[in-house]
Structure formats: structure tokens, C-alpha cells
């Protein structure tokens, strides 16, 4: 008797399980949420309606001083400034295929489980990687590490690097200052990420920058306290250190370069993030499709997602991202 590869009930079961398992980013899920107070805002506006364009409102900080006592409020209200960014979604799919009925007749369920697990991992890692690429692309707000010298803000952040310009605790503090008090009026203030009434920012650094940071005496001093380790919020999970309310996280997929300092300095493009630094726009849940091929002998499984990842911008300026260029110890050498 022939093996029945699938039924509509089985396909729906696996579709729901895949949609649940693959519905979030992997590493960057700790920074993502539906609120405009998340570093990566998840927008699902197209789940219930047709279309390919999602409009995201970028929320600016209120700057007014308010009124005191019985002074008149009418006429002294502050305009709520919002800017709109359009994000166009597209479809991404990937699939796997079984070897055949003879190979799978005793392990059909295992094949589906393996397909779900591997496609979930592939989508999670793909989204993480793509988001880092998007956030790193063509930065308009930058800081170049400068070992004890004058900070290089925007100008020569990468080209001015020398091998000694590794990550420092002082630079992390400077990044926060640049977020809250931009050095030029063309840069909007970067709103913090809210958690339990506190304001935080995130700095995502590469593995080599993390290595350099951990070997510094300043890092070891901060680690004597490590108060954040008891925090249950995902934002704090695996944070390497917290500097002046900047949560430092390590991610091995951070962009690297070998042409710093003009041509020879190896380093990384680390990412400082505030609220609404990026957008994860989704046009629906992950899809799961099964069909037989080779005249019913093999099962093909395809996972898909309609989405787009984007870095937010205000008047062509990065809205809540600062690229932090550092020289690093080349661990691949």
C-alpha cells in the first residue's frame, strides 16, 4: 500500500507549528517588539489587508518646557512631530526535499520535523544577518575609535583608524552622549529603549571587539558588580556589560573590514541602537507548503515569509543608529 505523504490536516498542523517557531528573529529578537519604544519595531499592518507597502510613523522626542502653575496652556501646546517612512515588503522562500519513499517510509514524521527545524534556523539566521547588513549600510552617523585622542565623529571614522584604536568604555559613554545630545542640529535625538521606567540603549559589537573589550582593565572593573544578570527582560539576556545604561551585546555576524586607516587596518562596524532604529515589516505569518515530486516519490517542503527589514531614516539621516568603527584584534589570522 502506498505511503500517503500528506493531508490537508497534516499540512495545516505543520504550517501552524512552523509559523510559531519561525515567527521571530533569533539573536535580535531581544531587541524587537511591536512598540515604537523597541529598538527593532515589528509592524504587522498587512496581515489583515492586501498591499505591499507599510507606512511606519517615526516618533520624535518632545522638546518643549511645558507650563507651570496656573499659566495658560492654550496656545502653548507642542506639535506632536511624526515622520513617515514607507517600507515595501517582498517574499522570501526556501525549501527542502526528501530522498524518496524507500528512504523515508519509516521516518516521514522525522523528515518533517527536521525540515521544520532546519528551515526555522535558516530563516532566523537569514533575518538576523540581513538586519545587521541593513543597519550597517551607508551610515550617516558614525564614531571612529581613537585610542585616547580626539573623537572622530562622522568624518574619517573609518579611514582615520590605526591598529591601536580598539573599543573602549569611554567610547561607549560617548556614543550615549551623541544619542542624547547630537553634535549637529541635522541629527535627531535618539530616543532610548524603555524598561521598567529606565532608559537604555544597545550596542551590538562583533566577536573581535568583544575580545578586545574583555581584555581591558575598565571592563573587569565593571564586571565586579554585574547587577544586570538578574534581570528577566530579554533585553538584558547575555549582555556582556552595561555602561551608563548602554547594554553591550556580542553578535558574531557584525560586519568586518580590512581597509580601515586608508587600506590596512582590520576592524568591525559595531552598531549603537536606540528606539525605532530598524523596522521588521511583515505581510503575514510564515507559510508552509508541501507537494510531491518525482511522481509522488519525494516530498518537497517550502517555507516562506513576506517581509522587509529597513533602517529608519529622518531627512536622509539615520534616525536611531550610530555606526561605531573600531580596529580589532584579527582572530582569523
Where are these regions (language model features)?
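Beta-strand elements of well-folded, non-transmembrane domains
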Residues: 60, 100, 305-309
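Generic secondary-structure boundary/loop-capping signal
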Residues: 37-43, 84-86, 93, 99, ...
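Short, solvent-exposed loop/turn segments at the edges of secondary structure
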Residues: 51, 89-91, 198, 296
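Short acidic, glycine/tyrosine-flanked loop/strand segments centered on an H-E-D-like triad
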Residues: 79-107, 272-275, 283
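Generic short alpha-helical segment signal, independent of protein family or function
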Residues: 61-64, 101, 120, 124
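Core alpha/beta structural scaffold of self-assembling particle/tube/pore-forming proteins
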Residues: 2-20, 105-333
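N-terminal "assembly arms/tails" that initiate or stabilize quaternary assembly
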Residues: 1-89, 317, 321, 326-333
